[in-house]
Amino acid sequence: MAKFVFITGGVVSSIGKGIVAASLGRLLKSRGYNVSILKLDPYLNVDPGTMSPIQHGEVFVTEDGAETDLDLGHYERFTDTAMSRLNSVTTGSIYQAVINKERRGDYNGGTVQVIPHITGEIRERIHRVAANSNADVVITEIGGTVGDIESLPFLEAIREFSGDVGRNDLAYIHVTLLPFIGTSGELKTKPTQHSVKELRSIGIQPDVLVCRSDRTISEEMKRKIGGFCGVPTRAVIPSLDAESIYAVPLTLEQEGLCREVLDVLDLTDHDSDMAAWQELVHKLRNPGPAVKVALVGKYIQLNDAYLSVVEALRHACIAQDASLDLHWVCAEQIESDGAQALLKGMDAVVVPGGFGNRGVDGKIAAIRWAREQRVPFLGLCLGMQTAVIEWARNQAGLTEATSAELDAGTPHPVIHLLPEQQDVVDLGGTMRLGVYPCRIAPDTLAHRLYGDQVVYERHRHRYEFNNAYRNLFLESGYVVSGSSPDGRLVELIELKGHPFFTACQYHPEFLSRPGRPHPLFQGLIEAAQQRLPSSPVEAIQTQR
């Protein structure tokens, strides 16, 4: 039978609950326990698929095609375990399910209420993850901050959960902040005390407190916090600001987080094997020469909009003993200032995914610059589509070429709507989503990087390369290095005679892991290193 851990947050939002959940998952897995982590999000959207990346950050896509919160990316990267649509729950999806049941008559004419129906549905979702994941421990992160109206049904549900399982079968962790007041020169515990008081008022007594701070927390302060909050001093876990999120599991291990959780859950504290993770963090702290990578996007106001792309670049740099010098470049600014002005000196260019017309011409200009200047280039999703448009306009003689998404009346729709999308009306959850196989062509850059004939990648798109122009592109120098098994869909392209120019319709960033970088990103960084003045790089084949 699975054990359950619930992680709440107090004092401020963005306190780091997701990283704590992912770190605990890593520590449990290092002891031989199977782990699954789910996120309960308090917003009314059914999923984040239609939300603005500038408001919400990136949409992380699972293997089974769920559009989820970016925290699921942290869960997968830290635990190296694939999550599913069951691991992402929103208030909107809960209410939708309950209302659908009411319409079907499942409640036999009863009055449908927040308690017990909404809270019961929430508890059922948590049990469902346990039943379908074969996990020894299910970790649940509750979004929002204790005291928010939106989070109350979730908090009530996890309070009720103690009636579903034994008290030794669940643990409550509360992540909180100890602010430093400069004028008094001390950390303050009062916000934490009030946050725990709020949590206790709804019937939840935390077993462990994870206290975020930017400076050392003394033993005396830990005793004070524990005394006021009803938590043993040893269960007050300091979590100081780290130079990298990948250092957090090691810090929490040193402070005894996993030991305390296992004690509450009455589980054996097996020996932990974190050697590979320690080596990873050592490499992060002792990087080689920096490579300058330009990320050309339209949502750069919020870095989280491209979180998985940035992490994939970091993973590749770790593997290549390089330091990532990331330059955020606004695609719209390229339209006004020119690519040369903003990209000069870059060792590589990445154009990630996106939607709509805004910034597209800037992306196309960046791609042309990378192609003509022979700078390593990687395009992702819309990045591939804009690479196709750039080639069509500047090399294939189709000066009016574009995507049907951008101009439905274009005479040359080199990118067009997938046939199965023709009659789709709703926006949410209707794209080509999830894992699909891709057949890699022999004697290509892609085959050298992947070292395999068939790979499986995650997708999120409605538009695809228009095969009516396929022969024209092939004749003019484009290489289709990856396609669907039936050959119908172009999934991966590259250019002959360029040091590194490739673009894919899928999202390889979702499959990159700290100790196992994605081949396309590692290949990009390896190619970028070749541009450094004095940094000999081993051939990428020797890395595998």
From Swiss-Prot:
CTP binds at residues 13, 148-150, 188-193, 224. GO terms for biological process: 'de novo' CTP biosynthetic process; pyrimidine nucleobase biosynthetic process. Keywords: ATP-binding, Glutamine amidotransferase, Ligase, Magnesium, Metal-binding, Nucleotide-binding, Pyrimidine biosynthesis. The keyword ATP-binding applies. One of its GO terms (molecular function) is identical protein binding. Allosterically activated by GTP, when glutamine is the substrate; GTP has no effect on the reaction when ammonia is the substrate. The allosteric effector GTP functions by stabilizing the protein conformation that binds the tetrahedral intermediate(s) formed during glutamine hydrolysis. Inhibited by the product CTP, via allosteric rather than competitive inhibition. Its EC number is 6.3.4.2. Catalyzes the ATP-dependent amination of UTP to CTP with either L-glutamine or ammonia as the source of nitrogen. Regulates intracellular CTP levels through interactions with the four ribonucleotide triphosphates. Belongs to the CTP synthase family. This is CTP synthase. It comes from Parasynechococcus marenigrum (strain WH8102). The gene is pyrG.
